[in-house]
Design a protein with these regions (language model features):
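Short, well-formed alpha-helical segments that are part of the catalytic scaffolds
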Residues: 12-27
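A conserved acidic beta->alpha catalytic loop
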Residues: 13, 38-49, 67
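Hydrophobic targeting segments
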Residues: 2-7, 23, 34-37
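Short beta-strand/turn micro-motifs composed of small residues
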Residues: 7-9, 39, 105
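A generic structural motif
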Residues: 28-33, 58
Length: 113
């Protein structure tokens, strides 16, 4: 079984490591497991944490839109941009291996940890 975990993240520096560890543990039976997160508008050290994870785990990828709130004040619109990027990533040929998709919302990062 091959899993792709995608999601949007914001201000998750305190919980992202525990969350990834929890997902890794729950999916330890997977033949292949990869992560792709899209970040925007974090006020903490989320980008540093994501970068650290991407260097530590070869199956962890992320991208950042930086600060979208200056030009796009509505959070729902910013989320739509980030989620659409997750969809683009999922649909890319390099991810045709994925059999199952797991979508993680940023608010869950707090509750899973």
């Amino acid at each position: 079984m091959n899993f792709l975990v995608v999601g949007t993240v914001r201000n998750c520096e305190k919980n992202i490591f525990k969350t990834i560890k929890c997902i890794d543990k729950g999916l330890n039976f997977a033949n292949k497991l990869e992560y792709f997160f899209v970040e925007s508008d974090s006020d903490d050290q989320t980008l540093k944490s994501l970068d650290k994870l991407s260097k530590k785990k070869n199956n962890f990828k992320f991208m950042s839109f930086g600060s979208l709130r200056t030009n796009i004040p509505l959070r729902t619109e910013r989320l739509a941009i980030c989620r659409n990027r997750c969809l683009e990533y999922l649909r890319s040929k390099e991810n045709s291996w994925a059999e199952y998709l797991i979508v993680v919302d940023a608010f869950l990062l707090y509750h899973l940890s």
